[in-house]
From Swiss-Prot:
UniProt keyword list: Cell membrane, Membrane, Transmembrane, Transmembrane helix
Observed effect of gene inactivation: Mutants show accumulation of both tetrasaccharide- and mannose-linked dolichol phosphate. The final mannose residue of the N-linked glycan decorating the S-layer glycoprotein is not added.
Transmembrane segments: 7-29, 34-56, 83-103, 112-132, 146-166, 168-188, 222-242, 246-266, 287-307, 310-330, 354-373, 377-396, 409-429, 439-459
Protein name as it appears in the record: Probable flippase AglR
Entries under InterPro entries matching the protein: Poly_Biosynth_Transport
Gene Ontology biological process terms in this record: S-layer organization
Major location (coarse): membrane
UniProt keyword annotation of Cell membrane present: yes
Membrane topology according to the record: Multi-pass membrane protein
Similarity remark: Belongs to the AglR/Agl15 family.
Coiled coil: none
The protein's annotated pathway: Cell surface structure biogenesis; S-layer biogenesis
Length: 476
């Protein structure tokens, strides 16, 4: 468990670093270029993610298969996956360039080549990270992921400062993927060998189901953005993406836990140790909402002030705060769904995840297509919330009986009570002195977080023990 705690802590630290650095750069970029330029990049990123779905399925298969002990070596798996991914990249790139007039009209941006470059470099880099996770080197993968985010942000900052414009956002992603990807390849403990048919079949047997879960993830994260691009301006798409990225902070902890526990749960699925899997899942669920619950409260009280940091192109739009609050609710549900779905994937139950994926994707498409034309960006948030809630219920019901666990009501209740105390403190301070300067936004958020943390530590002995255990195991 010590190794698992260290891996989770490092993954969480990497996610926090990447998110905060990215947020600072995003604030600068939007203030310089406007939220419309950021909306163009968000739509481009959505296209890249959707084009990457087949490759993501291969990457998931690599992580799972390299963790297994069978007659096929990790080197065979990774090499074969590299060849398959290369073929996917070629097809996707040809399609993207072949339909470039339509793509440029949709994006309102004449830079299809840069979109293609981001697609190629991102897919390749993510495969390398998958190889490291397949070797159960979560710490190394987390480190490279954080470095990727930092380098990408710094390149964007430098190029925007020198007047490159929206192209800078693409160059940042491409440069970082290439540079950090090269270091990642050299860190792999595998040799490149001839691809084998048996490895391809084994990868396919997992990916044919696993890709649908990835499609589900993409549907959750990017389908609303794609559909918004047909009905609203790039500025509104940019505002939606800003709110989505702010609320992303709330799911950093469950994301880190799920990534770190995946190899461990995967290694236990063929044994009689499913009770251990249940304990891992219960522990994860007890802390999954630690950031999302106070984050939701904070978005209601100071969400408008946080959005004001991004400049008038964001804060002047009346719907911006409502979008942030709505997406904060979505993120709260996602915290718990993430852990349960990752457990299903790690337990190698592709038939169950397949059914959940089909239902989620169908529901999400129908709701987005129905609600976005009527309610715009708010409709996208509502559609995502309803789809995620349904997916969470189905995921819990799909868990094997030996793994199913009751929700840790006491732990979650303590988090809500602590968030309530935080709300009282923040509301009192805001009534006494409303926020007037950007630095006050940071100070008020820190005051709220401190209040929440102290109250939670005093109320929840289990959370206090978890923190002490994590610090002990991570530092020891």
């Amino acid at each position: 468990m010590a190794k698992l705690a260290r891996a989770s802590a490092l993954q969480f630290g990497a996610n926090v670093t990447q998110t905060f650095v990215g947020a600072i750069i995003t604030i600068y970029v939007i203030n310089e270029l406007g939220v419309g330029a950021f909306g163009i990049f968000a739509l481009s990123a959505a296209l890249v993610k959707w084009a990457s779905i087949p490759a993501v399925g291969i990457r998931g298969a690599v992580i799972t298969r390299m963790n297994e002990s069978d007659d096929i070596s990790p080197s065979e798996y990774f090499t074969t996956a590299s060849v398959l991914t290369g073929a996917i990249i070629l097809v996707g790139l040809l399609a993207l360039l072949g339909y470039s007039p339509f793509v440029e009209q949709y994006l309102d941006y004449s830079g299809t080549q840069l979109v293609g470059g981001m697609f190629v470099s991102n897919v390749s880099f993510r495969l390398v990270l998958g190889g490291l996770r397949g070797e159960n080197r979560v710490e190394m993968s987390s480190l490279y992921e954080a470095l990727w985010g930092i380098l990408s942000s710094l390149v964007k900052l430098a190029l925007v400062y020198t007047g490159v414009g929206v192209d800078a956002l693409f160059y940042g992603e491409i440069t970082s993927s290439i540079v950090i990807g090269i270091f990642g390849v050299y860190s792999l403990n595998i040799s490149f060998v001839s691809p084998t048919r048996s490895a391809a079949i084994s990868l396919y047997s997992w990916a044919r189901y696993g890709w649908l879960d990835n499609l589900k993830r993409m549907s959750y994260s990017w389908l609303d953005t794609i559909i918004l691009g047909f009905f609203v301006s790039t500025s509104l798409v940019g505002i939606y993406e800003v709110a989505w990225r702010i609320s992303a902070l709330f799911v950093l902890l469950p994301t880190a836990i799920s990534k770190s526990t995946f190899p461990t749960i995967s290694s236990l699925r063929d044994t009689d140790k499913l009770n251990k899997v249940r304990r891992i899942l219960t522990r994860g669920l007890s802390v999954a909402g630690v950031l999302a619950i106070p984050g939701l409260v904070g978005s209601v009280l100071v969400g408008g002030d946080i959005l004001a940091l991004y400049g008038p192109s964001v804060s002047s739009v009346g719907v911006a705060v409502s979008v942030l609050v709505s997406l904060s609710v979505v993120r709260l549900v996602e915290c718990y769904e993430t852990l349960v779905m990752q457990a299903l994937n790690a337990l190698d139950l592709p038939d169950r995840t397949f059914r959940i994926g089909v239902i989620f994707i169908t529901t999400n498409i129908i709701l987005n297509v129905s609600l976005i034309p009527m309610f715009g960006v708010i409709g996208a948030a509502i559609a995502t919330l309803l789809s995620m809630t349904l997916g969470s219920i189905l995921a819990v019901r799909a868990l094997p009986k030996a793994v199913q666990t009751l929700p840790p009501v006491s732990a979650i209740g303590s988090q809500f009570v602590s968030a309530g105390a935080m709300a009282v403190v923040l509301f009192t301070i805001l009534n006494y002195r409303p926020i007037g300067q950007p630095i006050e936004v940071v100070l008020y958020v820190l005051a709220g977080a401190t209040t929440y943390g102290f109250v939670l530590l005093s109320l929840s002995s289990n959370f206090r023990e978890r923190v002490q255990q994590l610090l002990s195991e991570s530092l020891g």
